[in-house]
Amino acid sequence: VAPSGWSREATTGEDGTVYSVVVDLTAPGVQIIDDWNGFGQRLTASGTCLFGNTPVEDDLRPTHQRFGYGQSFYQIYHLSTLAGIARRAALSAAQELSQRARTFTTGNADTAAQDVQLLQVIGEVASQAYAAHAITQQAAQRLEHTAQYVIAHDQPRHDDDPQVALAELEVCLAVNPVVDATLAATTALFDALGASATASNKALDRLWRNARTLANHNPRVYKSRIVGNYLVNGELPPAQWRVGVAKA
């Protein structure tokens, strides 16, 4: 199948400057290798892409001159997907419990749908989904304000403008609670549904697998450190981050 669309790539010039470029995936010399074999979310722009003398447009430019809120934008995309997974977990859990016929002698009601402990689990899952959505929406609204600011001020660079850097900081603040809430929701739902919820035809495991895969794409372990470093030492988030060599 012929690829379509575009891919954002980075390349290093002869002077050591890292440049950003958007490549047409139908251009000559592009080879896409479908080698992403993660156990969850498939459409995460993962996998290998090779380029051989591939032509690009003339707007090649250093990464620090890209739109300043770019990293925040990509992260919000992942967070929105996570929030959607959490919501699906809540809806699926409620639907499954409403249809569950069997209960246990140690239960609290004649039917699972009336068992107060199981209803509590459903409520907790729904609360986790709500939290993931609300936090993501708050960060997205901040990012929208920043985008309008960038447009009005002719694309300020991230490392030159604290307003743009603070948008990245707010997204960093959102990452861990959204991930935690989503992973908790996609795990806890099984507590309300019993062993039958693990039936392969229900595929409820996909929710956790997708969430876990998304959460691993941009290491969240660093996000809290970045926030703490700003609060204690006043250091803004890094201008750009990617897979590469860590600075000492």
What is the meaning of each model-derived region?
Residues Q163-S200:
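Charged, glycine-rich active-site and insertion segments that engage polyanionic ligands
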Residues G38-H133:
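Glycine-rich beta->alpha junctions and the first turn(s) of the following alpha-helix
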Residues D191-A248:
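Glycine-rich phosphate/cofactor-binding loops in nucleotide/flavin-utilizing enzymes
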Residues V1-Q31:
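A short core secondary-structure module
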Residues E96-F104, A139-D154, L189-A192:
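Secondary-structure edge/capping motif, primarily at the C-terminal ends of alpha-helices
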Residues G84-R87, G123-Y130, C172, N176-L183, ...:
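Generic structural signal for well-ordered, non-transmembrane alpha-helical segments
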Residues E124-P177:
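C-terminal structural cap/anchor segments
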Residues T106-Q114, H145-A167, A195-T213, R242:
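Charge-rich, acidic-biased intrinsically disordered regions
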